[in-house]
Amino acid sequence: EAFLYGSASDNNIDPHIDSWPLGHEELVSVLTNASLIAGFKSDTPEKFVSDKNEQFQSVLGFHGMEFVLFREGQNRTVDAFKANETEEGMTSVKGIDELAFLAAVAGDVKNMTAMLEFTWMGNAASNDTKQVLQDNSYVFSSMRYNGFAAKGTMCYGQHLLTPAQTTGYQSWPGTINQIFVGGCSNICNEVQEQKLGQAWRVLNNQGGTTEDGEKESRDYIESPYSHRSFVDYKDNLYSIKNTLYGTRDVNATSPAANSIMSLLTSLNYPDLSKLQNALTAALKSLDDATAAQGYFLADPGSVAVKNAIDKIKDLDDELNAAGTWIG
């Protein structure tokens, strides 16, 4: 989630695979549409999703799959899939049709994540990824410049690492600032302001309006069916830690030698300890909230949630300060 700049945004991969909250009315429409169900059961269901997804964009990706797999924080049972759906408005939907939808959407996610890796890494992408895209080459047609940066002349990794006036970011400080602000701060702000903040504000009589002019909603909650919201939000923060530490080890206690934190150390960034402390406190705040109430949906308006909002906002402030200092 801290890497939503570049290919994920330019090629609309993130909204394609991670749209939420789930569009319930659209999901009802999809799962009761005989022609769409037939497409999900076709010989090439993932291609059907790729070609026809304008009819069900709000139910694609991880959260469409979540709806099929989980209810009330529990795995759905085999017996549940042998029967009809029990969700309001869907009681005519057969479990086997839901599984067809699940498999089709999962195949589409597989293709999109392969595309994300390939457009960042180019020929350095794994052989498995290259094979997925070779078998499903139609996905390139939906991408700008076949998915690549600088009008198709290079992969996004190369683009990020070659600052130049004509092809990449204009300077190294600009590149690092993009990582801090366009990457890390972007998801950090979303977690505290929207993923946690919107439901908390509404439940504490502080709800406002969204960018679209709609009233904020207490139901604006990610992963409500699996009850894994806090887990998801902590993973969002781990993506920030991975970015700063130069590692994929979320339990790392020190940054890699060639990492942004090590770079800040070498440059004698005066507020390095404030950044580190804010990261540690933000992660801990979600552990504390989990210990206090179990899962977000249990009490979205709680004191523990407000504490997490505040700590994650502190981290966002430190990320922007570091980005400004280096950029």
PLM-predicted stretches and their roles:
Residues 2-327:
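Mature extracytoplasmic or organellar-lumen-exposed domains after removal of signal/transit peptides
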